[in-house]
UniProtKB/Swiss-Prot annotation:
This is ATP synthase subunit p18, mitochondrial. Transmembrane segments: none annotated. PPR repeats lie at residues 36-70, 75-109, 116-146. InterPro entries: TPR-like_helical_dom_sf. It comes from Trypanosoma brucei brucei. F-type ATPases have 2 components, F(1) - the catalytic core - and F(o) - the membrane proton channel. F(1) has five subunits: alpha(3), beta(3), gamma(1), delta(1), epsilon(1), plus the additional subunit P18 (Tb427.05.1710) that is not present in F(1)F(o) ATP synthase from metazoa. Subunit P18 (Tb927.5.1710) interacts with the alpha subunit with a 1:1 stoichiometry; the interaction is direct. Subunit gamma is part of the central stalk. F(o) has three main subunits: a, b and c. Its main location: mitochondrion.
Amino acid sequence: MMRRVYSPVFCSVAAARFAATSAAKKYDLFGYEVDTNTAPWIEKIKKCKYYDEAGEVLVNMNVSNCPPDIATYNATLQCIYQSPSKQSTPVDNESKFCAMMDLLEEMQHRNRLKPNEESWTWVMKECVKSGQFRLGYCIQQVMETECKGCPADLVKANEANAQKAKTEGKEHPGHLSQQAGLFDVKVE
């Protein structure tokens, strides 16, 4: 009789205790406890001078079973934007935009994190800074779709880059302007 009376009480207490401990700890696919303290890693990323070093910090995080969170990825995007180059000696054909897009892809497909407005803002800032207004238009569209808007100052700066390219005659890539137009070709 006593077992029937106390059984629901003990079961609910045990279930509440288990739920409290499992909510505080995260486990990976293989049952190992995952470290969720990303603050020291973010500090390491912020101290990196080149963005290749920040990538190494992300690798070390994964090795230490501490998967990056959205704040870590955003700190890495900021590092890519602010660093002068990938390495101490510039690499041929390096592209900060490509590095950022690669990181966003890793976020989404590997760690199943959706980039937020801050993530896309760093990419848009790089488009404006590098003068790549066409890519800026694309990122603006993505931000309007995903984040419901793009910062007005970045939109204005991107438009200024487009107008500057138009006045300099560089609105379209040079190799396209050298080709004959479809309607300019005379067929005999």
